Amino acid sequence: ENDYAEFFMSYRIREQLSPDLTFATDIIMNSDLEDVSYLYKYGEYISKNEIDTAIYLSTFTEEEIESMARTYTEGYRLGFEAAKIDLSAKKTVNIRYFLGQERMVKAAIEQFRAMGLEPICYRYAVSRINRRLISRVGYSSTVPNKQLEYDHRMDEALFLDKKLMERKLEVLRQAYRNLAHEASVYAGPAVIEVFGENPFEPVSCDANPVLDKKQQEIQVEYRTESAQIVNEYIEQDKCSFTIIAYPIPEIGDRYREIFRA
């Protein structure tokens, strides 16, 4: 009998806190970003959005890319300055981005490193034991089938109970205990969002798994207690964040115009 919580959750926390897991960083820093075939190294779904984004960014001059990245990284640094938080005490930054944006992300990594921050780039959670609804926190690409993702947003209803919740909290606590130093030097997320996706109206189906009342209570209890564990190791008043957003090609024919607006 094994719920695999220890493996999947422990590894997920390591992904979020350790700069030693460099799968995505290596793709960004070591690939020829002029050749869009680098996108397929991720093993993710690659659509016209990702390809056209990468192609468009390849037309920018180095100065333009540096300027884009500087707006992003300086926004991050100034957030610490405004909050009077000592950024020099931090060693890592989590970069969240949309595939196709690697040319800008590469410049941002170099700028963050000049601030003394190593990048942490991880994929959005795919295991239901780590994922919340349809949230995609981390690097991601276009969702190939939004209805399918919506249909399975509460698959944990098939197995969630009090025992599993307690097990997850136990594993979470131990994972943070093992990575206490990494948590203490984590500066916070630097997020690159996208906008302009085609509207999607999900269709509900009675066959879809949904949490019952008891499971909803368990979920609320888990979120409350897990947040307390995270806050014990990552002091929120010593972290900051930044968010910037760019359009994606499916926004329409004026994509390039909107991008530069």
Report residues per predicted region.
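Active-site bordering "gate/hinge" segments
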Residues: 1-261
